[in-house]
């Protein structure tokens, strides 16, 4: 099931990015106008049996024009192996993106959530993005602008529907992306000053309800496999169904995301 969900994301990425470059080992998804956004400039390894050194070489080949390196490994077992190997190469790190499929959403109502277009919650989205970084990071405003733009492009590709809570003075948001019989809950965030009030649960439940109303057979969310939000998603009815390993090398200067 994880492969089908990944294919859903890849289809959106093909439509949202400016370029998709084919290589013998896989593909690179690029948006040269958004160089600070990692999610807009990354590569996918689709060939089995590559060594960590070969993966690094592929990253250098495909992302030579960028300060960062970000490369995902399509096959889960290959990704697990390469994540171990990459640890021996200075500057590189591995992360695990946990795919979680909705199994039992329960019967609880969404609560005080409001559906709005992105234009109606753009200021909140910008503040949520900025809150992910230290306020003194270099190029913070430019990075936030580029991430917001990439989110807009992805939303256009996936027919995004945004949900905020509370309905008055919103402090949390998420979106629902759609394609065929699949819905993805994405970009969940709550302002730091409003955390602990259950607002993330409220917007996620609203997105789940919208996904069910849209007739999606499968609704999923992606979380950091080593961070706490996955536990919240589990309480809302999502269950793990696979992992995507992403290998990264941060830039030596500046800031990216």
Where is each model-derived feature located?
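N-terminal charged segments
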Residues: 1-66, 77-83, 156
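Acyl-donor-binding surface of acyltransferase catalytic domains
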Residues: 48-124, 133-134, 222, 245-249
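A conserved beta-strand-loop-helix scaffold within acyl/acetyltransferase catalytic domains
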Residues: 149-191
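A conserved beta-turn-beta hairpin within the catalytic core of GNAT-like acetyltransferases
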Residues: 35-41, 178-186, 195
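Short amphipathic alpha-helix that is part of the acyltransferase structural core
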Residues: 1-11, 42-50, 54, 97-99, ...
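Conserved acetyl-CoA-binding loop-helix of GNAT-fold acetyltransferases
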Residues: 52-60, 187-192, 196-213, 231, ...
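A short helix-loop-beta-strand connector motif used in the catalytic cores of GNAT acetyltransferases and
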Residues: 13-21, 65-68, 95-96, 152-164, ...
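Conserved beta-hairpin
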Residues: 20-25, 81, 85-89, 93, ...
